[in-house]
Amino acid sequence: MKLVLIRHGQSEWNKLNLFTGWHDVDLSEEGVVEAMTAGKRIKEAGLEFDVAFTSVLTRAIKTLNYVLEESDQMWVPVHKSWRLNERHYGALQGLNKQETAEKYGADQVQKWRRSYDTLPPLLEENDERQAKNDRRYQLLDTHAIPSGENLKVTLERVIPYWMDTIAPEIKAGRRVVIAAHGNSLRALVKFLEGISDDEIMELEIPTGVPLVYELNDDLKPVNKYYLDK
């Protein structure tokens, strides 16, 4: 059984080196090229899908659309869930990463970005950036909507979705592709590979490059490789 993971192509805020999180930004021109290239590589590798999953953020949705178009699989059913969103960067969203490091210190910013259980500064309740003000989240329990997340909290929303929704599709023999985000995918990879809290700090997933897992019957990885050529 194979599972394909794809981090969205470069976004406009990736290009500007800004903390993005749940803020909904589009792909950059380079990101579009990355997504299209990913689709072409998937087609060349002969990978076919029966069902696709993505977040409710434009950059991941568009990446998946380009991948399916370039691999001639636009008809594949797509399921969107906020549980596959990027981690919520709280009050850091919209800030420049370099300027934030200069203000708070590089070590502190590195902890906010890469530590498993260090929370970023949270959004204030009345902050206009609160996701509860976004129509796509209006059906959610307000208690489920974060004001900021670390990787641990992100994992706690990603893995139940994996267990309840995605894994049963794979076990039923359906071929799955997931287009999501750096940290929601890091959370899933941590779970699949049993990566420690410390080791996960070093894991970086490149934008727009398909990551292929070969899984056993227990959905444990027996092999993995990037389609980067």
Curated annotation (Swiss-Prot):
The active site is at H8, E86. Keywords: Gluconeogenesis, Glycolysis, Isomerase. InterPro entries: His_Pase_superF_clade-1, His_PPase_superfam, PG/BPGM_mutase_AS, Phosphogly_mut1. CDD domains: HP_PGM_like. GO terms for biological process: gluconeogenesis; glycolytic process. Its EC number is 5.4.2.11. The record marks H181 as: Transition state stabilizer. SMART domains: PGAM. Pathway: Carbohydrate degradation; glycolysis; pyruvate from D-glyceraldehyde 3-phosphate: step 3/5. The keyword Transmembrane does not apply. Substrate binds at residues 7-14, 20-21, 59, 86-89, 97, 113-114, 182-183. It comes from the Bacteria. GO terms for molecular function: phosphoglycerate mutase activity. It catalyses: (2R)-2-phosphoglycerate = (2R)-3-phosphoglycerate. The keyword Membrane does not apply. Belongs to the phosphoglycerate mutase family. BPG-dependent PGAM subfamily. Catalyzes the interconversion of 2-phosphoglycerate and 3-phosphoglycerate. This is 2,3-bisphosphoglycerate-dependent phosphoglycerate mutase. It comes from Listeria innocua serovar 6a (strain ATCC BAA-680 / CLIP 11262). The gene is gpmA.
